[in-house]
Amino acid sequence: MVELSKNGFVCPKPIANKDNNYISDFNDKKFMIVSFLDGKSKSNLSPSECKIVGNQIARMHQITKNFKFTRNNDLSVRSWRGIFSQVKDKCNKIHAELPSLIEANLSSIEKEWPKNLPSGIIHADLFSDNIFFKNNKFSGFIDFYFSCNDFYAFEIAICFNALCFDGLKQNLSFNVTKAKKLMEGYNEVRKISKDEKVAIKVLSQGAALRFLLTRVFDYINTVDNAVVKIKDPEEYLKRLEFHKNAKSFEDYLI
């Protein structure tokens, strides 16, 4: 966030303490103070807003490609098998076929996952509640807790899942107009490569599985009187089905 701010990207700016550190301690806990970001999130983005978001994502990627530091993605494809092993025996309580659905998707994803695509620091959690607008103009991204090094195309795949599906969980449908506008905005700043286009299907399938698995884990391990609202894992079953049936990158745009 410090480096993004230095490069003119709009996000909360960390404020240094008296020792010129950004991370401080209070009662054995770490905390950071950041600048206030004007604006608020929208629950459902329009196609034109998706284009703006795509443009800003590409701007962010163009900035982060020059960063000298790295941060591992602790929720990358390498972690999903381990998460599944912790919920495999209980997730049928959520949906009877969930164990077999996860296993089938995970096996194919592990087999087809790309090994070498353009990469750098990504946000990795760009849901609509982390995207701010003010007076119908983009005003910044927030919540960089999950930011890490990964494929830039994986960020796009996450956004396809987070921003481009409409409807309730029983009848979710992929909004190709939103996806097309997202990519139009992105390609204005950074054109994705042929290899990234080829990989977008499995990356999107993987992004859906990643959020399904963490939601299943949270659902199973929630405690009584939990303050945080547990999100519905089943919202990702239709997403997985769509990605599994997609044939190519073009299926996301037409």
Regions found by a protein language model. Name each.
Residues 211-254:
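ATP/Mg2+ or Mg2+-diphosphate-binding catalytic cores
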